[in-house]
């Protein structure tokens, strides 16, 4: 009888390990998680992703919760079984001793209970790295490269490279502004300044990118970054002052923006395979950066490829035109629709009205 009980315990432990590993194996699958109410529950508040990278992260997140619930149910089941089946009162009713049967020195069981958790962690780590590599890979062959500059407390977006299929004249577009870029490079050194570090200038902006087509956010206007749907895109990030973080919730991903990113050995670039939905999506700074950090928003406006090509052509041909005029030209709302500017004037917010319309 004792030998049978031992075999039963081994089988239960093995079953628990198999179920746990099975759940974790699902975590690395590209299979979409359940939909409906169950799917919403498993997402635990995560928004629906609009890039393949976001979908991969969302799938991984949901299936990890499936694995966690499977393992949790098994462990709580064993825990409650031990409480109610082997409790002192139950043992007393059965006429057994005060202490339940002891299982120490059961080497096979101890090995199972040691090895299975290690394998679970290893499997989870494997699929974590697999998903992370997909998200951070720089192999997307981008057709649009956007320079993103964060500063207290707004954003500047510029187009540095655009594939010929989306650019004016059908030729690859190089958007760097040579004159301003040269001026930025010249700001690097200031031998006559009071900075003691090898004559480096305090106002060095040589690491920032300056483009002919740019969208600059202001206190009164949320910057709208226009991008094409179904197109690989690269983002090149930097900060003009303190640490910021570029975050679009539907990307399920954020990347910090630092001053002098190369000198700080931080990765300033990330790529997405495509954006799968058109529409307006709010973007935010996800790094505490000072007084108005919470109001440092922008909007991602995703349009079809033809509209994006027309948008770029209009801005290239009309350098003095505003971003709002270019958006109107392609039939889009001229100002942000997903978020509003914050009125920073204290005297204007006494009644609690702290947003204003661009209209």
Swiss-Prot record:
Protein purpose: Subunits I and II form the functional core of the enzyme complex. Electrons originating in cytochrome c are transferred via heme a and Cu(A) to the binuclear center formed by heme a3 and Cu(B).
Protein localization: Cell membrane
Topology class, membrane: Multi-pass membrane protein
Binding-site residues for Cu cation A1, renumbered to this chain: 244, 285, 289, 296
Native organism taxonomy: Bacteria, Bacillati, Actinomycetota, Actinomycetes, Mycobacteriales
Site (Not N-palmitoylated): 29
Superkingdom of the source species: Bacteria
Co-factor binding comment: Binds a binuclear copper A center per subunit.
Lipidation (S-diacylglycerol cysteine): 29
The protein's enzyme class: translocase
Major localisation: membrane
Recorded catalytic activity of this chain's protein: 4 Fe(II)-[cytochrome c] + O2 + 8 H(+)(in) = 4 Fe(III)-[cytochrome c] + 2 H2O + 4 H(+)(out)
One MF term in the entry's GO annotations: copper ion binding
Protein name according to UniProt: Cytochrome c oxidase subunit 2
Organism expressing this protein natively: Corynebacterium glutamicum (strain ATCC 13032 / DSM 20300 / JCM 1318 / BCRC 11384 / CCUG 27702 / LMG 3730 / NBRC 12168 / NCIMB 10025 / NRRL B-2784 / 534)
Region described as Disordered: spans on this chain: 168-203, 335-359
Catalytic activity, EC: 7.1.1.9
Pfam families: COX2
GO cellular component, as recorded: plasma membrane
